[in-house]
Amino acid sequence: MDRTNQRPTRQKLTSGDIQGLAKDVLNVARGNLNPETSTRIESASDWLERYCLSNKYDASTAVDTLISRGVHANAIVDYCIPRIARIYGQEWSNDSLSFATVSVGCAHLQLVLKHIIHQRGFNVLGGEGKCILLAAPAPEQHTLGALVLADQLRRLDFSVKMCLGRPAEDVTKTVFENKFDAVLFSASSLETVKISAQCVNLIRQDYADQPVFFLGGSFLSSGGHEGMTHDFDHMTNKLDVIVNSIESATVMLSEVNRS
């Protein structure tokens, strides 16, 4: 399998290790922190929110400043970036910020994320973690959440390949040419959901090794997706649900293969 964009090999983690780490990530993302840490991260988020809209913006300066204030890089990814992206979206909906301004802010958040990933110093190596495809088929343009999820999954020892903003044909081709334990689709619109569902149905018809299919993204927050339950195995934005579902599916497959 093509190991591009994967997390490097480190000490092999058990399912229990992975689920425990997922809970740690969620504690940060949900703000389940002690008051001192929570206040520090909230303050850092407020600063980063303003700085990403500044004409003096620099990704390296942003990360260095936050770390100097005692905010761990993982907390920036798991809490600060998603929180600020939501705020930008709300302010655009309220006409407090223009679409152009929000686009600039989100692009700067993405550069912060890329800088942190680069600082981790991970080499592109074949890992032993379960393999996941993270897809956002064209014309999907909202990919920041998918990039955050990819980083979180890699820290949990998953191997992640991304197919973002690419035609549906590229997504299905990638699945057919590789072997994934799960395929996660990210969608912000009904159009992307329908395209993702078409990909799932095509893969189910023509592919022997069936991965677990997920639908996530901001579309789930808008409602109106109840009738699509038959197209995907799971519809969720919760990291622990994703991790537990993949682990459970792998255990079930192993038991079937042994029988």
Predicted regions, residues:
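Short coil/turn segments
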Residues: 137-142
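Cofactor-cradling patches in redox/metallo enzymes
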Residues: 163, 167-224
